[in-house]
Structure formats: structure tokens, C-alpha cells
Amino acid sequence: MGQPSIDLPSRLLRNLKPWLGASHWRIAFSGGLDSTVLLHLLAKLAKNQSIPALSAIHVHHGLQAAADAWPAHCQAVCEELAVPLQVQRVQVQPGASVERAARDARYAAFSAATQANDVLLTGQHRDDQAETLLFRLLRGAGVRGLSGMPATRALGQGSLVRPLLDVTRAELEAYARDHGLRWIEDPSNQDRQFSRNYLRHQIMPLLIGRWPQAHASMARSAAHLREAQGLLDELAQIDLTQASLPSEFEWSGLPSLEFAAIAKLSDARQRNALSHWLEPLTRLPDTDHWSGWVDVRDAGNDASPIWRLADGELHRSAGRLWWLSGEWLRTPVVSGDWHDLSSALRLPDNGRVMFSGQTPVGPLHIRYRQGGEVMDLAGRGHRDLKRLLNERAVPGFVRGRLPLLFRGEELLAVANLPGLDGNALEGWRLHWQPSDEDQGLR
């Protein structure tokens, strides 16, 4: 048995206590039972408690004809409760899973609306947590997936909070009946071709019939697994700290790790550390695709192996693991002559270059390595550029992007490489700032 519905306001306020200092609480309001109860609870609390500014957001997917009436319903409910409402229309991208595509579009809208120190509140409850655990178990999820929905996580510039995870659906229904609330029944929630609906309507009733406390037990298991995941995260932090000594190429802005520090770990600790490191950068591979990491790890020292993932690539080069995405995966285009040497020159798909100190005599232009370049070094004569790059252990993926400064056919400088990046006698150096495009998920 859950706690009586009359206790819901105090439980909700207790769960939201850590976020009372937020600038804004925004309710993800679909118009369904869960979010309707959450909205009503918070609107009532706002009358006698000091809580942040309150509003709601309704995301309209337009996936079914019935949904066209939902924004008006949500607007009427919000007006009755004196809560401002934002209706956000989104386009759902076609794909194999309509459920996932709609969720992605919805959370993209939520993320865009969540500003610094804002909190987005969603209405998932304990029954949802149990379904999530079972659904992910059937998909072969690991500890992180089986830990269920977190009570809070980062979203946009603020936070997403699920304050009803300790509340049952039965409690929400009782509260709604007691207060005469009206809510939307989404017809798609009855469509059992969707996996979650099948679990909810076909499987869960059988489990509850045999084990009445199944929802509570599964939610408790998810909590245990969250604790276990926390320990794995702590272990990953220890291992990543050992592998996070700075490289000679910090100016690249690329996330990187010392390869040897990762390779010496057990296979399980390697996967744990890399999963933790890669999670903010890319969608993680499933178990079957971790063979790509084994190929990178076990390649010979003279190789430059690459593991291609959903949102970028993991490279092994110069004794390190490097994460590349965005412009780093596009071939830079030659920019032509550099006319105003006093200003930085923007390079298509490759950041910008600039001088410090004096500026050399022009005309000058930037090229990229093609092979066969030679550089005249004071006291050393003519030296092959490939050998000079080898001496400095420049990663292979950097070599094709390094801006080379030419006067006519004479190679004057290689940006950012000490001893090659300028002329001490003439008092100038060439600096390259690679693109600061986000290295990670958006």
C-alpha cells in the first residue's frame, strides 16, 4: 500500500527541497494523469509556500489527430490554476522507433527551454520506474541502464528533476479523483505494438497478480543498482585521473587519455573507465560493438587505429587516446592568401591562425601538408617536414590539419610547434587556434 494521497504535498515538497533555490520550476505538462497531478500539487503549494516561479511547457508532436486538441486542454487547465503555459510544436524525425523519435524531439524542446538555474519537473512515478527496469532488462542493459531513471540529471543549462518516483500510480489516481481533476487519456498508450505499453498492459498485471509488491521491489532493485553504478563511477574517476596527465598538444582542445594507463587495467575496468569518459561525448556502443575498442587497444605501436562511434571517433596515436568529432572529422579547405596579417585568418573548417610579435613580409598564404614539404632551419639546413613531425610525435590526425605558412613556395612556419612555428630573429610566431566546436553531444 502506498501512502495516502493527502500526504502527497508534503512528500513532494520534501523531494524538491534541494531545488528551492532555483530561479524557475517548469513542469513538463502533457495533460496526462501524472503531469496533471504534479501541476495541481505545485500550483496549490505556490499559494502557501515560498517556491520558485512556476510555469508549464506542453510539447505538441502532432503524431495523431486527437493530439491537436491537447494544447487547448492544457491551456485551460493552466489558466484555471494561474500557471503560465508555453506550447512548443516539434517535428518528429522519421525512424525505426516512433516512441524514441518522439521522446528525442520532446527532450530537445525541454533542453532548449531550460536556462541556467532552471529546473524542469516531470511526472514519472514508481510504476514507471519498475517498467523501465523490466524494459531495459529485456534489452540486455548493464548496471547503468538497470539503475532506472535518475531522480535528477543535467538538462540544457539547468536540471531535470523527477519528484514523484516514490509515488505510485494508484496514489496519483486517488489524488486526481479526490480533487476532481480532468486529464487526457492518450489513445496511443493503449497500443500494444509499443513495447512499453505491452509491458504495462500484458506483463505487469500478471506479475502484480503473483507478486503484489512487484513495483516496489523492482524500484528498490533499481535503487540498489544506482548505488552500484555510483561505485563504478568512483572507480572510473580514479582510473581516469591516472590517465589524464596533460599532453604536449593541449592546444588542440581535444579530450585525450594516456593509452598505457588505460591498457594496463583489467578488461572490465577498461570498459568501465572508457564508458564513463565517453558518455558525455557520444552515444555508447552496445556490448557487441566493444570489439572496436579491442582492435584499437591491441593494434601494433606503429599503427594508428580508429574506433568509429555514433557521434565521433576514438583515435590511438602518439601514445594517447583522442576523441575527435565535428570539424576534426572534416577535411579542411585551403583558404588562399592572407592579406591582412595584423588580423587573425579564419580557416574553413579549421579554426583560425594569427601572428604574435612582428609580422613577416608577405605575400603569405596558408596550405596543408601534401607530402614532400621541406623546411630550411637555421643551423640544420633543409629538413624534410615528415621527419620533423615524427621527431615531435605529432599525432597523425593533426598533421593534415596543421596550418603551414608559405611565402610563394617557401615553407616559413608550422603553426604551434616550438622551433618550427616562427622566426626568432625576425621576432614572430604563428599560432593556430583549432575550432572550439563542442566535443560532445548536443
UniProtKB/Swiss-Prot annotation:
Any GO molecular function: ATP binding
Top-level lineage group: Bacteria
E.C. number: 6.3.4.19
Localization (cell): Cytoplasm
Leading EC class: ligase
Keyword Membrane: no
Residues binding ATP: S30, G31, G32, L33, D34, S35
Catalyses which reaction(s): cytidine(34) in tRNA(Ile2) + L-lysine + ATP = lysidine(34) in tRNA(Ile2) + AMP + diphosphate + H(+)
Keywords: ATP-binding, Cytoplasm, Ligase, Nucleotide-binding, tRNA processing
Membrane-crossing residue ranges in chain numbering: none
Pfam families cross-referenced by the UniProt entry: ATP_bind_3, TilS, TilS_C
tRNA processing keyword on record: yes
BP terms from Gene Ontology: tRNA modification
Free-text note regarding domains: The N-terminal region contains the highly conserved SGGXDS motif, predicted to be a P-loop motif involved in ATP binding.
Family: Belongs to the tRNA(Ile)-lysidine synthase family.
HAMAP family: tRNA_Ile_lys_synt (MF_01161)
Entry function: Ligates lysine onto the cytidine present at position 34 of the AUA codon-specific tRNA(Ile) that contains the anticodon CAU, in an ATP-dependent manner. Cytidine is converted to lysidine, thus changing the amino acid specificity of the tRNA from methionine to isoleucine.
Record protein name field: tRNA(Ile)-lysidine synthase
The species this protein was found in: Pseudomonas fluorescens (strain Pf0-1)
